[in-house]
A protein has these predicted regions:
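Class I SAM-dependent methyltransferase SAM/SAH-binding core
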Residues: 80-131
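Beta-strand-connecting loops/turns
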Residues: 81-82, 134, 157-159
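Conserved alpha-helix/loop element of class I SAM-dependent methyltransferases that forms part
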Residues: 51-52, 58-99
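A generic alpha-to-beta junction signature in SAM-dependent methyltransferases
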Residues: 78, 101, 153-156
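A short glycine-rich, Lys/Arg-flanked "PGG" loop and its adjoining helix->strand segment in the class I
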Residues: 145-170
Length: 198
């Protein structure tokens, strides 16, 4: 999933140059990602792409099958190969969600240790999600509500975001469901101005 990663700095979006120093089969364990625009570099250590932030070494608690099914349904992950981002405590369900939906999942700032698989990758970041614009089908922000604004950039038009019921969304989202735990919104995509010709 390295091809989806982008420099989190504020400049024109571009791919990152990757140099790997240690791999296990197809999994990158150690290496560096470099930005060709601003020359920033980001380490890959222990299989985690580190753009800032940290990842806990604690083991993930068991997530109930009902909770995984609920997240999959709220994110509308019906197509195998869809891309979902699970943030913070939501990332505990990354492996189970990937198995259930056959989706690719990025565990962003997980609250516990997540093992990478063919469809699950771990990324640590601070205030900007280091993914390509309009590349994600769904994102569950959990306790990473500060990333809601940037979620609008990475979601495809019609992509869904699930957040705690206390969250508020910028105008780039349209709320579609709410219960006592969560609120679900849909990305409306970029607005295109229409001009009449004279």
């Amino acid at each position: 999933m390295i091809d989806l990663l982008r420099c989190p700095r504020e400049h024109e979006e571009t791919w990152l140059v990757a140099a790997f120093t240690r791999m296990d089969g197809r999994f990158v364990l150690e290496g560096t990602l470099g930005c060709p625009i601003c020359s920033a570099s980001y380490e890959i250590t222990g299989g985690v792409a580190r753009f800032g932030g940290d990842v806990s070494d604690a083991f993930a608690p068991v997530v109930s099958a009902d909770s995984v099914m609920r997240t999959a349904a709220l994110l509308n992950l019906m197509r195998p190969g869809s891309l979902a981002v699970l943030c913070g405590s939501e990332a505990n369900a990354a492996e189970d969600l990937s198995e259930l939906t056959q989706s690719r999942v990025i565990a962003l700032n997980p609250a516990s240790n997540i093992e990478d698989t063919e469809r699950v990758a771990t990324v640590a970041t601070l205030d900007r999600i280091p993914l390509a614009s309009s590349s994600v089908d769904g994102i569950a922000v959990g306790d990473c509500q500060s990333l809601i604004g940037d979620a609008a950039r990475i979601l495809k038009p019609g992509g869904r975001i699930v957040a705690p019921v206390t969250a508020s969304f910028p105008p780039a989202f349209r709320e579609i469901a709410r219960d006592d735990q969560s609120v679900v919104a849909e990305s409306i995509g970029p607005l295109i101005g229409i001009q009449r010709s004279s």
